[in-house]
Amino acid sequence: GHLPRGKLDDFLAMIESAASYVVRNGPVTGEDRWEEDAGYSPFTLAVEIAALLAAADMLDACGKNEPANYLRETADCWNDQIERWTYVTGTELCAREGIDGYHVRITPPDGAGAASPKDGFVPLKNRPPGDSHRPAEAIISPDALALVRFGLRAADDTRIVNTVKAIDALLRCELPQGPLWYRYTGDGYGEHEDGSPFDGTGRGRPWPLLAGERAHYELAAGRPGKAAELLETFERSAGAGGLLPEQVWDRPDLPERELRLGAPSGSAMPLVWAHAEHIKLLRSLRDSKVFDMPPQGVERYIKRKTVSPFRTWRFNNKIRSLPAGKLLRVELAARGVVHWSSDKWLTVRDDNTVENAFGVHLVDLDVDGLQPGSTVVFTFFWPEASRWENVDFTVGIDPSDSQ
């Protein structure tokens, strides 16, 4: 590493606290990176998983191997399920674009069962009344490129390539300076069609920031020429003073509104994280690689193809099934006894949870020998409160080739 052991210790408490928050609250996010929706977001999942792997390396360096192993186990489990949570197949868009599927922007947070990207609706902010919910499968976003940026998926992974085709079909906007992209399908954060300012509703316009992110994807895919072209597009989207705007105008000129095609809209300017992305892109192009890509995921998932031996059930992620051959890990926020059966209560087992270094109370249920079609049913006894949960939860055993 770049820091001596003594310096690492100075950061350890902060890293442990951050990792604890992620493992206790993930994989679902309460708010996506656009500060709008809760659920399973490819972007947030990528950040969470990459962060856990990096934190694990830090803990190992400080001699905390058992907590480090737990972080990697959690990262592996979440990484295994990214496609189940966020990748849809067999939609109208798939048929139209000749692809088998694509990653969606976000899927609803878990309620009574595990999220399916084809089930449920996602609330859209900044939309007029009566038009504020869309099927999750209908909302595309460039956010899925984060799976490559953070080292979890190869740029040429078929599902990533399919997603890029879907992104370009719905979100790419050709402008005088080159192509830019919208945030997501149906975005209402931007000026109205007549150029009047955003007033709680409107229409989202292209974000130069996303050209920088796409350039990093092109570089990861081995296309530095395309990345360099997008750098030029990115820079040509700046205002007269060289400041990068949040959004640019994508309609014919409206001189009376001071809006010109391809020029900054009335959005925030400068958008500081767009400038940060610009600086990172300059560095990446100089290095001929994505310089800020965390190496842990690349090594673990792309090269070694590590998979998880279990699936996790928790109250914010109540899985309804797991592949045959996997253990069932139950994670709780308080000490509990898992009262469970795999034969419709003919026989019963009681397994106590154990608290780990991050305040997670967990136990692994030995269900890896159950055959497909079996069902595990369980409830909880809470010793501290001396009460039963009084609700039964079930997890079915699927064929081993299911996610």
Language model feature labels by segment:
Residues 293-403:
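Glycan-association/targeting regions that enable binding to alpha-glucans and other polysaccharides
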Residues 42-43, 49, 69-209:
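Extended ligand-binding clefts on enzyme/binding-domain cores
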Residues 1-9, 29-36, 55-73, 154:
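Inter-helical turn/loop segments and adjacent helix faces that build the functional surface
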Residues 42-59, 214:
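Extended, hydrophobic/aromatic-rich amphipathic alpha-helical segments that build helical scaffolds
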Residues 23-40, 119-130, 256-264:
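Acidic/His metal-coordination segments adjacent to aromatic residues that form catalytic metal sites
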Residues 134-154, 205-306:
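C-terminal capping/lid segments that line or modulate ligand- or cofactor-binding pockets
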Residues 8-23, 49, 53-56, 68-83, ...:
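Hydrophobic core segments within long, regular secondary-structure runs in both alpha-
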Residues 1-26, 45, 49, 274-275, ...:
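Aromatic-rich carbohydrate-recognition surfaces in CAZymes
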